[in-house]
Each structure stands twice: as C-alpha cells, then as structure tokens.
C-alpha cells in the first residue's frame, strides 16, 4: 500500500472484514433485528404433547395453579304459565277491536245499508259486541256476520239487530219492550239504549246465566232477564210497546200477539219448515182483535222452540 493510501486507510482490508466498525445503539439494534432470522434458522424444539386429564388445564412453569372449577348445571328458564282468559274476554291481539273507532266503522256500514234512525245507530255504537262472543271469535265481532254462542244458538248479525230494532221503534219512544231469545244478551243491551224497560226471556239455562255475566260489567239497570218459555211470553209485564223475537217459528204464537199493546209492533222471522225461506215479518196491532202483517226481508234464524232446557 502506498504511503498516501496508508494514510487514508490505516487498516488493511482483511482487518476491516474481521473487525467491523461499531455503531451507535440504534444501529446495533437494527443489526440485531436483521440478524435475528439467522438465529431462527435452527428449528426450535417442539414440546412433546402431554396427556391432560379432563377438566385440568396445563399451566406454564412458575404459575400458581388455579383452583379447579366447579361444574355448574345449566340454568333452564321455566316457561311462563299463561294467565287464564275469561270466556268472554277479547285476546290481547284484538285490543284494537275494543276502540270506539272500530264500532264507528260498523255503524258507518249500517248507515250505508239503510239504517237511518240516529238512536239505533248510537245504541249500536255504544254496545261493545266483542264482550258477548267467545274470545276466539273476538276478531270477527264487528263483522256483519252471525256467530255461534253455543247450544246450537247464534248472535245475530249487526245489520239484522239494527234492522229489527228500527222496525220495532218506527220513530217512537219505547217504554216497555219484550225480547224472546236472550241468547248472549247483546240485543238486549242494544235495546236498553232505546227503551225505558227491557224484558228478555231465554229458555236455555246456560245461555241465561251467560247473558247475566255478559251484562253485569255494563251495569245496565233497565234490563230484566227471565228464564222460561219464550212462546208463552211474559203476561205479568204486558202490554208491550214492542216485541222482538230472535228465533223463527212457523207462525207467531197467539200469546205474544195478545201481549202487544194497541199501536205496538212485533218483529219476528217467520217460516221454519225445511226448505222454506224465513221472512222477517212486521205485525202491528191496530185494534183489540185486529193485527196487520207486513212481510219484508229474507233472513235466517235458529228455530223457535217451546219449553225450557
């Protein structure tokens, strides 16, 4: 090596390779990081699998052993027991049916179908029909359809109830009304809004009891229910301004015609023979021994029977 070159490079090239120049700590760290993979060239020892007992965890050396866990039985929630539902109560899903708006829509349909007396329409709007049918039928309570109430009997369609009451009233103020066939009590409840006193007879004892239960929450003071034969009527309370019969016979019993006041009106379905259509019939008593009959609409009712059960 020349003198000038020796001054510039005091160490031989071999020495530079054997003793590399040290650098600051950060550079050393960088070299260490770069050199780290070389150290990893040697495969690490793989620990042999250790058979563990069920439920025991293998802990690293120097770690305090944890207390064995206590096995807990899974908590199974008890199913909620359904609350009993009253026979005439509307289900929760039918809550909207209890609103006045639903009854108002029913009244709008009645008005569109020809019912014009505002007292009848107000009475139909005031009585909650869903309280008089079984809970399973509550969603149909305000449809214009007859519904079963048990014992092979039905609650009449709202349009038929309104039509019969309007015919019986004929624009008059009713004092005393007789209903034959209480059923579930719905028509009697409507009549109580347009008459001073309502007398209603039911021949089927379970329906008579059911009507009392249905009417009790409404606290209707002017309805008098009777258990007996409707074909006989109620002579002790006669004469009546109006009589409404909610069952169809071959004719109207003479006993009921005799209990109608002069000027009074009786409304009943007539014609119960097999294959014979029933016709809604209006009978007016014009004198002591004279009645006038008008045959009106085709209808369908359960038969009018005698006796009690």
From Swiss-Prot:
Compositional bias segments (type: Low complexity): 33-46
Catalytic activity, as annotated: [protein]-L-isoaspartate + S-adenosyl-L-methionine = [protein]-L-isoaspartate alpha-methyl ester + S-adenosyl-L-homocysteine
EC numbers for this chain: 2.1.1.77
Active site residues according to the UniProt entry: 156
Ranges of biased composition (kind: Basic and acidic residues): 14-32
Matching Pfam families: PCMT
Keywords annotated in UniProt: Cytoplasm, Methyltransferase, S-adenosyl-L-methionine, Transferase
Entry's localization field: Cytoplasm
Highest taxon above the source species: Bacteria
GO cellular component: cytoplasm
SUPFAM superfamilies, alphabetized: S-adenosyl-L-methionine-dependent methyltransferases (SSF53335)
GO molecular function, one term: protein-L-isoaspartate (D-aspartate) O-methyltransferase activity
Region (Disordered): 1-46
Biological process terms in GO annotation: methylation; protein modification process; protein repair
UniProt cross-references to HAMAP family, sorted A to Z: PIMT (MF_00090)
Family note: Belongs to the methyltransferase superfamily. L-isoaspartyl/D-aspartyl protein methyltransferase family.
Record function comment: Catalyzes the methyl esterification of L-isoaspartyl residues in peptides and proteins that result from spontaneous decomposition of normal L-aspartyl and L-asparaginyl residues. It plays a role in the repair and/or degradation of damaged proteins.
Protein name: Protein-L-isoaspartate O-methyltransferase
Organism of derivation: Burkholderia vietnamiensis (strain G4 / LMG 22486) (Burkholderia cepacia (strain R1808))
Gene: pcm
